[in-house]
A protein has these predicted regions:
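Surface-exposed repetitive/solenoidal architectures
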Residues: 1-200
């Protein structure tokens, strides 16, 4: 858990998380060597957010805005990250990754996780302008605009061999795989989800 937060701090330039004499690196690379549990029981048996979230550690997306957009390679190596939780209805670029530009995300599963933001919200990535492959997300995603089970928005990016199981809700541009795409490619992706669009 600590290493994952440290990596997010490294990419985002957050000295409060990434302590020591470290320079921000938005092109940093990482490869998981084990599964990671951040929180336990984020979602109940019905897939809804747990009743008591007071003890949860909040997640900050890797590449959490345009200035910190991620361009490295993140290889999950077949492992899972469990229990990511973020709940702020005024935040953009929300997901495991917030904003990817030229980066590569592969071979990782995100389970028992909840993301709620304002715009560009996705289980894997809020705004994908890179390459995502062989990943999955089991959880709940919600927001106002550009909301997707895997990616909230995807322009000039690609998504392949990925799947989503869970619930996604948004007011507009909402989809099970991706909320909005432009000059992007989606191949061999599927979902099993409830979709609620046109709601707050």
């Amino acid at each position: 858990k600590e290493e994952l937060y440290w990596f997010a701090g490294l990419v985002n330039g957050d000295a409060s998380v990434c302590t020591g004499n470290v320079t921000q690196n938005t092109a940093a690379c990482a490869k998981l060597t084990a599964s990671i549990t951040v929180n336990t029981g984020v979602l109940d048996a019905s897939g809804n957010l747990a009743g008591d979230v007071s003890g949860f550690s909040s997640w900050t997306s890797i590449g959490n805005n345009y200035n910190n957009r991620y361009s490295g390679t993140f290889d999950g190596n077949g492992y899972t990250i469990s229990g990511l939780y973020f709940n702020s209805s005024n935040t953009y670029n929300v997901g495991l990754f917030g904003y990817i530009s030229g980066g590569t995300i592969k071979n990782v599963g995100i389970v028992d996780s909840y993301f709620n933001g304002r715009e560009d919200v996705g289980g894997l990535c809020g705004n994908n302008q890179g390459t995502i492959s062989d990943c999955y997300f089991f959880g709940s995603v919600s927001g106002n605009n550009f909301v997707g089970g895997l990616c909230g928005e995807m322009c000039n990016g690609s998504l392949s061999s990925c799947y989503f199981v869970g619930t996604v809700s948004g007011s507009s541009n909402t989809g099970a795989v991706c909320g909005y795409i432009d000059r992007a490619t989606i191949t061999n992706c599927f979902f099993n989800s409830d979709i609620f669009s046109g709601v707050a």
